[in-house]
Amino acid sequence: MFIIDDLFVSPFFSLLDILQTMALDEMYDTKSIRDDIKENQLLYEVGERSDEEYQQRKQALESQLEMAEQVQEQMRDRMEVKK
């Protein structure tokens, strides 16, 4: 009975794990957040953003980047090496 359960249920859970990993990778993409930080700085330097807008956006992006790095670190710790 348990062998049959493993045959049918294991692929389903594996698929859910893969989907969760892909969703987290997309939600917490550090490269895109770093690009947003650079864009924010560029807009400030060319005068399209006020100092207040720049500081608020910079602070929000930096906290978002910190969160993304923590999530990615947890994901790396969770990964298994499969042969």
From Swiss-Prot:
Record keywords: Mitochondrion included? Answer: no
Q: What happens biologically when this protein's gene is inactivated, per the record?
A: A single deletion produces very low levels of gas vesicles, in situ. Deletion of gvpG1-gvpH1-gvpI1 prevents gas vesicle formation, cells still express gvpA1. A single deletion yields fragile gas vesicles, upon complementation the gas vesicles are cylindrical not spindle-shaped, in H.volcanii.
Q: Which UniProt keywords apply?
A: Gas vesicle, Plasmid
Q: Where in the cell is it found?
A: Gas vesicle
Query: What induces it, per record?
Result: Part of a gvpF1-gvpG1-gvpH1-gvpI1-gvpJ1-gvpK1-gvpL1-gvpM1 operon, maximally expressed in early to mid log phase. Gas vesicles appear earlier when grown in static culture, possibly due to O(2)-limitation.
- Coarsely, its chief localization is other
List the GO terms this entry assigns under cellular component, sorted alphabetically: gas vesicle
Database matches in Pfam families: GvpG
Matching InterPro entries, A to Z?
Gas_vesic_GvpG_halobact (IPR054797), GvpG (IPR007804)
Subunit notes for this chain?
GvpF to GvpM interact with each other in vitro, and may form multi-subunit complex(es). Might interact with GvpA1.
Q: Which family does it belong to?
A: Belongs to the gas vesicle GvpG family.
Described by its record, this protein's role is as follows: Proteins GvpF to GvpM might be involved in nucleating gas vesicle formation. A minor component of the gas vesicle. Gas vesicles are hollow, gas filled proteinaceous nanostructures found in several microbial planktonic microorganisms. They allow positioning of halobacteria at the optimal depth for growth in the poorly aerated, shallow brine pools of their habitat. Expression of a 9.5 kb p-vac DNA fragment containing 2 divergently transcribed regions (gvpD-gvpE-gvpF-gvpG-gvpH-gvpI-gvpJ-gvpK-gvpL-gvpM and gvpA-gvpC-gvpN-gvpO) allows H.volcanii to produce gas vesicles. A minimal gas vesicle can be made in H.volcanii by gvpA1-gvpO1 plus gvpF1-gvpG1-gvpJ1-gvpK1-gvpL1-gvpM1; lack of enough GvpJ1 prevents formation. A similar region restores gas vesicle production in H.halobium without the p-vac locus, but it still has the c-vac locus.
Q: What else is known?
A: Encoded in a 14-gene plasmid locus called p-vac which produces predominantly short, spindle-shaped gas vesicles during all stages of growth.
Name of this chain's protein? Gas vesicle protein G1
Source organism per UniProt: Halobacterium salinarum (strain ATCC 700922 / JCM 11081 / NRC-1)
